[in-house]
């Protein structure tokens, strides 16, 4: 199973582009499955409750919960939902989100350690969007989550740079895609076209 993880700060379009990439892969005849974190499993439901809370969230606790939810997904959830092991698993956020988000409060080294059982992705697509653009998109939503504050997202964005360096050092193919170019937001089709082309190439598949 080849894991393709899509990452970025909240408001960068990770969920949208994960769904579109999966559709392109499936349309090309690839046995692809779309997976989202937090999952719909028992631990994932607990995490979602914390994320919607207006109270503070303990970073260490969240790191452990996300790690447990991730292993549940990899060992049980994916097989059940995907009807076996897919050729390509497109993940709407993976352990790199934990390293960035919980790494801010708990330290990258410790969060990395509790996620060692989760294999590295083959490809990590990082959608790079300025914090102010992400916040504008988040503000347009009906509901916001506990992590979606300007100060915190800025720290997460900086932490992602460390996470990307770590992933590269471990042999992960990192694909950085700009969501804004020349000060102008790129359209969804434009961004997805670049993501699909570069992912297909990295996987050794015919052009999307």
From Swiss-Prot:
**Would you tell me the protein name for this molecule?**
Putative thymidylate kinase
Q: Which UniProt keywords apply?
A: ATP-binding, Kinase, Nucleotide biosynthesis, Nucleotide-binding, Transferase
Quote any Pfam family the record assigns: Thymidylate_kin
Q: Name one GO biological process term.
A: dTDP biosynthetic process
List the EC numbers from the record. Answer: 2.7.4.9
Q: Could you give one GO CC term from the UniProt record?
A: cytoplasm
So what does this thing catalyse? Answer: dTMP + ATP = dTDP + ADP
* Keyword Glycoprotein (UniProt): no
Sorted alphabetically, which PROSITE patterns does this protein's record hold? THYMIDYLATE_KINASE
What InterPro entries is this protein classified in?
P-loop_NTPase, Thymidylate_kin-like_dom, Thymidylate_kin_CS, Thymidylate_kinase
Q: Lineage of the source organism? A: Archaea, Thermoproteota, Thermoprotei, Desulfurococcales, Desulfurococcaceae
């Amino acid at each position: 199973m080849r894991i393709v993880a899509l990452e970025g700060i909240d408001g960068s379009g990770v969920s949208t582009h994960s769904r579109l990439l999966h559709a392109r892969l499936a349309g090309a005849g690839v046995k692809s499955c779309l997976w989202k974190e937090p999952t719909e499993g028992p631990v994932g439901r607990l995490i979602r409750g914390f994320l919607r809370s207006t109270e503070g969230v303990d970073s260490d606790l969240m790191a452990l919960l996300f790690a447990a939810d991730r292993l549940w997904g990899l060992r049980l959830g994916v097989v059940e939902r995907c009807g076996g092991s897919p050729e390509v698993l497109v993940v709407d956020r993976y352990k790199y989100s934990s390293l960035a988000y919980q790494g801010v409060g708990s330290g990258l080294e410790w969060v990395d350690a509790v996620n060692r059982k989760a294999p590295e992705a083959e490809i990590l697509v990082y959608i790079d969007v300025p914090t102010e653009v992400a916040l504008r998109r988040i503000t347009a939503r009906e509901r916001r989550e506990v992590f979606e504050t300007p100060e915190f997202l800025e720290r997460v964005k900086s932490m992602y740079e460390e996470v990307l360096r770590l992933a590269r050092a471990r042999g992960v193919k990192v694909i950085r895609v700009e969501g804004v170019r020349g000060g102008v937001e790129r359209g969804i089709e434009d961004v997805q076209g670049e993501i699909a082309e570069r992912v297909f190439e990295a996987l050794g598949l015919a052009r999307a």
